[in-house]
């Protein structure tokens, strides 16, 4: 593993909550996935293994399938679609009652730390209108968002929904990235097909969206918030199966919940608060990512050193994006080594715990 990757992993470990007896149910993460339609259900993976409380908000017809995944899931079949709203065919777009139709979900948001939108969502017009209202409300409440799959279509058609909302992560594949860039008129077509070219393209698209963090999936995952670019070069598997992206969105949901706990001081990190009151520069964020807060240990290992100051929010958001990518790629590598060509997205689930321990590991203070 490269030295930059080791340094990033050392910083990721700082935002992972230790397992303490005083924590109670839900403190380490209340995350909901909005997805699951008449056509498809999300393949739920990582967050169900690592966080506190796991919710799925879905269309009624997919609820039974999703419930069969695990008894640990709390499934809420309250997402409306044209199958459940008979008056939609006579209503213009945007739907005049979209806000009212979204109300059962909106009233649920106060219970959540993070919202993941897109896996298995589908493109039903009623559902898309309702999800638009959900994104607006989540943004007003400053709830971190992860948008993938069909949720990216909403961004493509209505970029103002998330423009400038820096608590949001998009996870487009190559095709989705190109569509977003075209819709936003981001000049990326002239970029060379290299890591440097992809980083610049990712940066341009992020800037076109006002600094939203983007993970561009590919042979190496490229991550940018419009100021700082990082690349995840953790080796992945060679098989691409439908549903693998849900492992990424799941891991991001979990990591964002841990990030929230870190910044709210849920446990004593031994760090001093970072100086506030000014906008962070690119150099500030890059210094955070290079673990300049450590007195020594420039290979990224802890070596008993204590960080002097807390990581900034922009830095931890980039770390979440990078760590989600790294864990997903490691799960894919392990699953491919075990199953080869027969590997399916569900095989990644069995590799989650080992991948987490090997890459990040339990933080100091955890008693197992």
UniProtKB/Swiss-Prot annotation:
Keywords: ATP-binding, Cytoplasm, Lyase, NAD, NADP, Nucleotide-binding, Phosphoprotein. InterPro entries: Carbohydrate_kinase_pred_CS, CARKD, Ribokinase-like. It catalyses: (6S)-NADHX + ATP = ADP + phosphate + NADH + H(+); (6S)-NADPHX + ATP = ADP + phosphate + NADPH + H(+). GO terms for molecular function: ATP binding; ATP-dependent NAD(P)H-hydrate dehydratase activity. (6S)-NADPHX binds at residues 120, 173-179, 246. GO terms for biological process: metabolite repair; nicotinamide nucleotide metabolic process. It is found in: Cytoplasm. It comes from the Eukaryota. Residues 3-359 form the YjeF C-terminal domain. It is an enzyme of class 4 (lyase). Its EC number is 4.2.1.93. Signal peptide: none annotated. GO terms for cellular component: cytoplasm. ATP binds at residues 217-221, 236-245. Its cofactor is Mg(2+). Its main location: cytoplasm. NCBIfam families: yjeF_cterm. HAMAP family: NADHX_dehydratase. Belongs to the NnrD/CARKD family. Catalyzes the dehydration of the S-form of NAD(P)HX at the expense of ATP, which is converted to ADP. Together with NAD(P)HX epimerase, which catalyzes the epimerization of the S- and R-forms, the enzyme allows the repair of both epimers of NAD(P)HX, a damaged form of NAD(P)H that is a result of enzymatic or heat-dependent hydration. This is ATP-dependent (S)-NAD(P)H-hydrate dehydratase.
């Amino acid at each position: 593993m490269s030295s930059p990757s080791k340094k990033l992993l050392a910083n990721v470990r700082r935002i992972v909550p230790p397992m303490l007896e005083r924590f109670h149910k839900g403190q380490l993460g209340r995350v909901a996935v909005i997805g699951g339609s008449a056509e498809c259900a999300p393949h739920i993976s990582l967050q169900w293994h690592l966080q506190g409380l796991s919710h799925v908000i879905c269309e009624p017809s997919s609820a039974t399938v999703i419930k069969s995944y695990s008894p640990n899931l709390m499934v809420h079949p309250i997402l409306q679609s044209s199958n459940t709203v008979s008056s939609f065919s006579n209503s213009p777009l945007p739907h005049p009652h979209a806000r009212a139709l979204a109300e059962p979900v909106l009233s649920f948001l106060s219970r959540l730390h993070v919202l993941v939108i897109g896996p298995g969502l589908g493109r039903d017009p009623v559902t898309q209108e309702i999800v638009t209202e959900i994104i607006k409300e989540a943004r007003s409440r400053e709830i971190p968002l992860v948008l993938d799959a069909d949720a990216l279509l909403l961004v493509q058609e209505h970029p103002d929904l998330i423009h400038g909302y820096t608590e949001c992560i998009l996870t487009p594949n190559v095709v989705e990235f190109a569509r977003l860039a075209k819709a936003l008129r981001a000049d990326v077509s002239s970029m060379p097909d290299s890591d440097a070219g992809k980083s610049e393209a990712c940066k341009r698209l992020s800037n076109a969206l006002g600094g939203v963090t983007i993970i561009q999936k590919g042979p190496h995952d490229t991550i940018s918030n419009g100021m700082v670019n990082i690349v995840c070069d953790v080796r992945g598997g060679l098989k691409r199966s439908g549903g693998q992206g849900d492992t990424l969105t799941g891991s991001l949901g979990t990591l964002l919940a841990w990030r929230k706990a870190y910044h709210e001081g849920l446990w004593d990190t031994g760090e001093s608060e970072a100086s506030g009151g000014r906008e962070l520069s690119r150099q500030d964020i890059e210094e955070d990512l290079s673990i300049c807060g450590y007195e020594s240990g420039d290979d990224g290992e802890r070596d008993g050193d204590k960080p002097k100051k807390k990581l900034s929010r922009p830095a931890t958001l980039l770390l979440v994006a990078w760590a989600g990518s790294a864990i997903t790629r490691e799960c894919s590598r392990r699953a491919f080594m075990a199953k080869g060509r027969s590997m399916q997205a569900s095989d990644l689930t069995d590799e989650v715990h080992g991948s987490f321990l090997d890459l990040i590991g339990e933080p100091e203070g955890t008693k197992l």
